[in-house]
């Protein structure tokens, strides 16, 4: 039995737009509850997830692999508990005229697994809606908001 969280979605868009949705702070802000992902996205670089351009950091990590627009692998931890570090892989591929996005969040503690299993579906559904329609889901309005449980993807 694995403790990995695996989420696959198909999005009517391009790999470049999915890559930008994940890595461009202003793009991410549109669908990720006004939060941004900040980094230069080069292997070995640090990244941070923040609602206010890095002043209030919610998640941190390092870029382990970066192959735009196909694959991004990062470590993922709360700045308050760096020892509870996990790993997220984003694999982006064209399939039958649409993008298949596979997100695998691995090396999860029980606490982290609980939070991200609620957060990732909200965030990724919002990204899909935003890329396909131009309108994101208000993930902060969903019962408790995306950031209400420790370790969630927001």
Description of each model-found segment:
Residues 6-7, 13, 17, 26-58, ...:
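Short beta-edge strand/loop motif at the mouth of beta-sheet-based domains
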Residues 15-16, 64-70, 91-100:
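A short, structured loop/turn motif at beta-sheet edges
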Residues 9, 60-65, 86-93:
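Hydrophobic/aromatic beta-strand elements that line small-molecule binding cavities or substrate pockets
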Residues 1, 41, 53-57, 80-84, ...:
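A generic structural micro-feature
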Residues 50-52, 59-66, 73-80:
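Helix-adjacent hinge/juxtasegments
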Residues 21-22, 31, 66:
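Conserved catalytic core of Hanks-type protein kinase domains
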Residues 75-122, 127-129, 139-140:
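Beta-strand/loop substructures that line and gate deep hydrophobic ligand-binding cavities in soluble
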Residues 18-19, 28, 47, 63, ...:
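Hydrophobic pocket/interface hotspot
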